[in-house]
Amino acid sequence: NLENIKCTLKTRKILKLYNYKIVIRHLEEQLSLKKDNKNLKKEIMRCLAGYADDRVIQIIKRHLKVNNINISIICSESLLKIAKNRSKTFSFEDYFFDTIKNFTHQYFKLHCFRISLADNKSTFFIKDQIDYEMRRYLYIILKVVTLKIPNSPIDSHIKNIIENNDKDLPYILEFLETSFSKKTLNLLMPMIDPENNYKNEKIQNQLSNNPLNSWIKNWSESDKNWKSAISIDYCLKHDKEIINNIDWSKVVSNPILSQVLENCDNKGTSIPLEKFQNKTEKTMFTILEKTILLKTVDLFQDIPGELLSQVSQISKAKNYDNGETIFRDGDVGDSMFIVLEGKISITKGDKEIALLDKGASLGEMALLDNENRSANAIAKEDSILLKINQ
């Protein structure tokens, strides 16, 4: 029942009534028997956080891998909970050094990948995805590093360190320098200390070993729909030579990619277009186009494109004629809108209280608090709005 979100907490409480060694053994068996059940694996990792046994640390470490960020985030969080609740000492820094090294190397590789990309519109989503993955890797690294001193100030500063806006960073850096070994600091500092950058020679070596084309090819063949779609979209717009190097048998058909390939010129390429034909209704904007539009809105600009694409898939663009009402004061607030084109007048009674144009959002408060609309919204001219349902 651990994988059933409705039963998870209750199941954990019941398991606490049994001998912890038996529980740990059975959970480990489940991990082995149901390797492909990702939801179960996540919940077992969360469940194991309630046991401070050395065996649990070993089990979780095995699932802390660079090729599965989602599981690794949960593993790092569970390990920190264990470290905070342990009374016995454990050599966390030495035991997890190789793990930290693997994650910092992956972070560095992504850093080099980003450097190799040109600064233009066709690389926007790839850079956005790299930034997203780098932030998540850094989160895992800082959580695992903190295991050595679990009640240190590092944990409470992780979010700000990742966002590069921690006012206390000088004190955090000083704390790290006095608390960790030189080999750990050598891995950590280039990621968080603005004055301690990666050496240019090291970057150039990495770029030689993993050139841009190999990254784009690997991402195109990824089983992650978003990464695959944005990489193939990049190839079509910027570098068609990569297209013929892609192993299309590895590329998974998905709605985003189907739209990317829908009107592409297949001449001189090896793209098996029939594999990616998706019988969906025609839309005014593709998922990628809607995601780009959402990224221009203040409300969504800090959300990674991969997550925003999920919002794009449940949104619809709609035309409104000049003078047409979008919603009235008192209507049920079951959706929000983004202005894509035109102008929208927000009125209360006979008074205009706001005039919204491209990029503005409206109706979001009613969506969040389930209250009725508190004003009227009327198209001031012919407009196109993106409607996002609850």
At which residue positions do the language-model features occur?
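Structural detector for internal amphipathic alpha-helices that build alpha-solenoid repeat scaffolds
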Residues: 1, 7-20, 29, 39-53, ...
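Cyclic-nucleotide recognition modules
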Residues: 352-390
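Eukaryotic acidic, Ser/Thr-rich intrinsically disordered low-complexity regions
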Residues: 247-285
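Alpha-helical adaptor scaffolds
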Residues: 191-225, 229
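Regulatory nucleotide-sensing modules
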Residues: 288-349, 356-360
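Amphipathic alpha-helical scaffolding segments comprising HEAT/armadillo-like alpha-solenoid repeats
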Residues: 1-2, 20-34, 53-65, 84-101, ...
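Short inter-helical turns and helix N-cap capping residues of alpha-solenoid HEAT/ARM repeat scaffolds
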Residues: 3-7, 34-37, 67-71, 134, ...
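A small-molecule sensor/coupling module
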Residues: 281-293, 307-310, 372-373, 380, ...
